[in-house]
Each structure stands twice: as C-alpha cells, then as structure tokens.
C-alpha cells in the first residue's frame, strides 16, 4: 500500500474552492486548521467540521466528487446523515469529516468564534485545543503544549489594538466619558 501524502495548504485551497462553489457550511479544524493559521506542524489529512444537516451533507458529497473523490453509496449515506466521524480515503488526499468534534458544543457556536484566514474558515485555536484535549488521544495530548504556545503567540499578533476609554465612548457617541 502506498503512503498518502501529508497535508498541504494547497489541498485546503482545493476544498475551500469546491465547498464555496457548492455552498458547504464548514470550518477547518484539528491540526490542519492550526497549520492554516501558521502552526509549524504536519498532519496526514484535512480535518473538517461541517454543519450537520442533510442538505449540507449533500453539498459536501457533490463538492468532494467535483475534486476527484470517489464517494460510494455507503459513504455518501454516512456524510448525508452527519455521522459523528467520517474518514474519506478515496480521493487525491485524505479527509476527515468531524460532525461532532470532542470538546465543542455546537457548530453555530464554533462558527461564531471561528477565524477567516484568507479563503479558509478555520475554527478558533481555543476550540481546536479544546477538541484535542477532550479527545484524550495520546498523539493529541502530546501536541497540546506546542499548540498552547502557538495560540498565545497567535493571539498576541492578532489582538485588537488597545483603545482608551475616551476612544470607546466616542465610538458609541458618548462624549461625556472624559
């Protein structure tokens, strides 16, 4: 059996374009999501947290077929029904659809906290870390200190600029805050 290529951002780009064209609602999650934010790691697959609905599942199937994935009927049914975890190894690279990631309460909440990194909708690093911690898998637990360090640096670089009380009041139209 030949070894699968490791994750490359180009694969995420392919998925992002296909998913946008098909109208799929999703976030990149897991280590591949962190890599898209600049994390210096490697992984073997693209991890995707899709919104769980029959319609979204059908759009996922159409999008993956469009970029060369062979989706047989049993696999299609798992995707359309939103099975908690679906591994897809029948395409140009490996994809994990995680409809119910450990440690994350709901897709709408995660999406509201998510980040837009160029064309990539990515789960917030805190959600990625919470999911890895909740999974309890040894390989995820080993990665946690590195992900936490990366998160701290990422949040420092992407923090909104500090504003004075006067600036905040002025933005609200309250001029008596001096």
Model-derived regions: residue spans:
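Compositionally biased terminal segments of proteins
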Residues: 1-178
């Amino acid at each position: 059996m030949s070894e699968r290529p490791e994750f490359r951002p180009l694969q995420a780009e392919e998925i992002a374009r296909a998913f946008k064209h098909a109208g799929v609602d999703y976030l990149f999650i897991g280590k591949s999501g962190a890599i898209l934010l600049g994390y210096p790691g490697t992984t073997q697959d693209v991890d995707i947290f899709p919104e769980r609905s029959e319609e979204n599942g059908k759009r996922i199937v159409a999008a993956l077929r469009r970029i060369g994935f062979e989706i047989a009927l049993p696999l299609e049914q798992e995707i359309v029904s939103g099975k908690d975890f679906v591994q897809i190894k029948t395409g140009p690279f490996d994809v994990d659809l995680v409809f119910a990631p450990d440690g994350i309460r709901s897709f709408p909440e995660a999406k509201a906290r998510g980040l837009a990194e160029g064309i990539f909708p990515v789960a917030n690093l805190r959600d990625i870390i919470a999911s890895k911690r909740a999974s309890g898998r040894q390989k995820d637990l080993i990665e946690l200190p590195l992900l936490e360090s990366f998160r701290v640096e990422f949040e420092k670089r992407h923090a909104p600029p500090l504003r004075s009380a006067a600036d905040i009041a002025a933005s609200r139209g309250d001029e008596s805050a001096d």
